[in-house]
Amino acid sequence: MARIVGVEIPNDKKVEIALTYIYGIGRTRAKQICEATNIDPDKRVRELNDEEISKIATYIQQNFKVEGELRTEVMQNIKRLIDIGCYRGFRHKLGLPVRGQKTKSNARTRKGPRPSRIKKKK
């Protein structure tokens, strides 16, 4: 397995797909990276030589925030919303949907499982 930006990417996948294993890189960015580094996106990772792997790694480090750096930025943004006390921060703090969705019947993912009820014996 090749190691790019601290992430082991699978050898048997095409470069375009394998790059999406890195947090912060989706299909569109993976295509951009392949285009910018002149690497065929349909090539398998095991077919890449060390020079091509290092070319991809340096391009990603210079142009994108990925992995830990991106995760910390997202967490800091959420923390900032909570600290300033805005509506979105309040919703984050309560663990409810942030973007205006209804919560009367749905939103189980954000709310978590329903509290269990104890049945009375007759």
Curated annotation (Swiss-Prot):
Keywords: Ribonucleoprotein, Ribosomal protein, RNA-binding, rRNA-binding, tRNA-binding. GO terms for molecular function: rRNA binding; structural constituent of ribosome; tRNA binding. One of its GO terms (cellular component) is cytosol. It holds the Pfam family Ribosomal_S13. InterPro entries: Rbsml_uS13_C, Ribosomal_uS13, Ribosomal_uS13-like_H2TH, Ribosomal_uS13_bac-type, Ribosomal_uS13_CS. Residues 98-122 are annotated as: Disordered. GO terms for biological process: translation. Residues 101-122 have a biased composition (Basic residues). Coiled coil: none annotated. Located at the top of the head of the 30S subunit, it contacts several helices of the 16S rRNA. In the 70S ribosome it contacts the 23S rRNA (bridge B1a) and protein L5 of the 50S subunit (bridge B1b), connecting the 2 subunits; these bridges are implicated in subunit movement. Contacts the tRNAs in the A and P-sites. Part of the 30S ribosomal subunit. Forms a loose heterodimer with protein S19. Forms two bridges to the 50S subunit in the 70S ribosome. Belongs to the universal ribosomal protein uS13 family. This is Small ribosomal subunit protein uS13.
